[in-house]
Curated annotation (Swiss-Prot):
Belongs to the NAC-beta family. The lineage of its organism: Eukaryota, Metazoa, Chordata, Craniata, Vertebrata. SMART domains: NAC. Residues 123-158 are annotated as: Disordered. Residues 33-98 form the NAC-A/B domain. This is Transcription factor BTF3 homolog 4. InterPro entries: BTF3, NAC_A/B_dom_sf, Nas_poly-pep-assoc_cplx_dom. It holds the Pfam family NAC. Residues 134-143 have a biased composition (Acidic residues).
Length: 158
């Protein structure tokens, strides 16, 4: 090809600029249900089995937060060493769940809990502690025992 024809063809080709049509890029919106279907199909390939009867799952992280699942769907594949936990998750502090979670804590979590308790400021504990005045007011609501009811029931039995 000669240079004149090549220059003429290059002048005709317009890549961008004023007057050219825009190419619209298609945006694919992914929904949560589509992601869930993909996840379930991947789990099906692993041959997972449902585990029934699990009321709650707590995942304790190193920073003292807990990922808490209430009534989750738990699936396991022992051959792939994989557990899938699906459901509504809540992120909570370990102090919020303390009375019920103590039996689930391991030795390392208990030591981190001790450290957390030592770091917990005394001011918060003092402000939450009930004052003696408040205790006396609560006692006023309870009526005092006037008579002995055990004797009356014994007399009726005789």
């Amino acid at each position: 090809m000669n240079q004149e024809k090549l220059a003429k063809l290059q002048a005709q080709v317009r890549i961008g600029g004023k007057g050219t049509a825009r190419r619209k890029k298609k945006v694919v919106h992914r929904t949560a249900t589509a992601d869930d279907k993909k996840l379930q199909s991947s789990l099906k390939k692993l041959a997972v089995n449902n585990i029934a009867g699990i009321e709650e799952v707590n995942m304790i992280k190193d920073d003292g937060t807990v990922i808490h699942f209430n009534n989750p769907k738990v699936q396991a594949s022992l051959s792939a060493n994989t557990f899938a936990i699906t459901g509504h998750a809540e992120v909570k502090q370990i102090t919020e769940m303390l009375p019920g979670i103590l039996s689930q804590l391991g030795a390392d979590s208990l030591t981190s809990l001790r450290k957390l308790a030592e770091q917990f400021p005394r001011q918060v504990l003092d402000s939450k502690a009930s004052k003696p005045e408040d205790i006396e007011e609560e006692d006023d609501d309870v009526p005092e025992l006037v008579g002995n009811f055990d004797e009356a029931s014994k007399n009726e039995a005789n």
